[in-house]
Every structure is written in structure tokens, then in C-alpha cells.
Amino acid sequence: MFDVTILTIFPEMFPGFLNYSLAGKALEKKIWNLQVINIRFFAKDRHLTVDHIPYGGGAGMIMRPDVVGDAVDSVLSTHKDTKFIYMTPSGTKFDQSIARELVGFPHITILCGRFEGIDQRVIDEYTPYELSIGDYILSGGEPAAMVILDVCVRLLPGVVNNSGSITEESFSYSGGVLEYPQYTRPKQWRKHRVPKILLSGNHKKISDWRQKQSQVITKRRRPELLDGEINDKFT
């Protein structure tokens, strides 16, 4: 089973959209397990304070290391070999290859930051794997954690009925390029027709056409993928 623990100050956000579609069904079938821990439970005062102003001045608030550290320790006490992940815009950009590596761990822990982030000493103490889902800023790490889990869960055996759906989609198809165009009925819609090659029944020609289209689309939209930048970045 793929076992996941989330550390957050907003536990009510989970499972969120993960409770629907493939991830939700997989959760019901116990293909994966989700535990959510409220970081505020480890606060040191009656107000359940988890943040404070930054030393040296600056905007916003920083999550306290003593509070976050105790929350992390609570997980490590029962999951010593967990893969500890911290969601941060300055982290390694998440991709399909990283997702494939993550599902190989029996347990992962995802720390969701808030405010201006967590005290650097938490990172120095635990050296988490810092991950980002893109070059933009969210209000917190929770939505990013859900994105990562959605990608990972659908890779688990028994989640997607047709394994070909996984192997032929973008970043998995033909060495990590973008997926080829897809068509279904009707054969003609308005002025647009399905390419004749897809109606030919010649599987070799169809496969060649799809590979060529993937290369063309990737070169136009994400040329860096053809230079080998999609690879195993997981450390």
C-alpha cells in the first residue's frame, strides 16, 4: 500500500479533490492510505500559535521550528524510513519521473507550508526533499501536495484499468515527450475531419504517425524535453 502522511494547519482541506474520480476510488479500495496531521496540535500556547515574525524584519510570518519540528518527529516516531517532502516554490520542479520514484516508497510525508514558509532550521535539521509544482506562488502547500498525490496515485497498480492510458500519455509516451493528438467519433465535426491514417487500420502506420506528431508538438511547445531535460531527477 502507498502510505501518505500530510502535515498541515488546514487538515480540513484533505482529501479535497483526491476524494473524487480515480484517486477517491483507490482510497476506498485501500490501494493507498491518507493520514492528515494538524500541525497546530503541537503548538506551545493556548492560542495554538504556529508562526511568528521573521528575525531581521521583513513581510509576513514564518512557521516556528519548534512547532513544526515536533509535528515531524511525531511522524518519524512511527515511520522512521518515510520519504520526507516539503512543498516550496524554491524546490525541484516536480515531473512524471519524480512521481514514478515516489510511488516506490512505502511511506511519504508531505509538509505543507503557509505564510512566508518555514524556519530554515527545520530544513537544516531534517533535509527534506524540497519540491515545487511550478514557478508561481500558492497560498500554501496543500494544493501542491494534492497535485503530487493525484499524479502518484494514478500510477499505482489497480488504479487505472487500462495501463496503456498511462504509458501513452504525455511525459510517459516515447521517452518523455508530449502526447500525440487524440480523436473520437464523429469522423467529421464542423469543418474538421479525423486524420485518414487513424481510420486505416494499419497499426504500424498509426504508431509511426503518433510518434511523429508527438515529436512535432514537443518541438513546438516544449523543445527542452527533446534535449533530455525530462529524466530521473530524483535524489
UniProtKB/Swiss-Prot annotation:
Annotated EC: 2.1.1.228
Protein name per Swiss-Prot or TrEMBL: tRNA (guanine-N(1)-)-methyltransferase
Biological role: Specifically methylates guanosine-37 in various tRNAs.
Keyword Ribonucleoprotein: no
Subcellular location: Cytoplasm
Entry-linked HAMAP family: TrmD
Family to which the UniProt record says this protein belongs: Belongs to the RNA methyltransferase TrmD family.
Naturally occurring in which organism (per UniProt): Wolbachia sp. subsp. Brugia malayi (strain TRS)
Pfam families: tRNA_m1G_MT (PF01746)
Gene Ontology molecular function terms on file: tRNA (guanine(37)-N1)-methyltransferase activity
